[in-house]
Amino acid sequence: MFKAKSERADYVSKIVVEVDGMKFDGDETSQDRMARSVVALNDDNETVQWVLADNTIAQVTRVQLKQALRLAGEAQTAIWANPYL
């Protein structure tokens, strides 16, 4: 079980999701950052500077961050139960 959980953590740390042609890191720390930004931005079209998975900087909207967060969460959920199956 320990090995399976370790592998799961490794897979989660490598999650990358794509929204509007931009690739976002989707690991747990990145998901936390996305969630904080989504809460802090007041308007769906308000933008924030974001470092993408390839280390380029982009202006992203609240809507784009919400989509990236959802996709990353879905990817993590798909991975998370594997050690117990």
Where are these regions (language model features)?
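A preference for well-ordered globular domain cores
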Residues: M1-L85
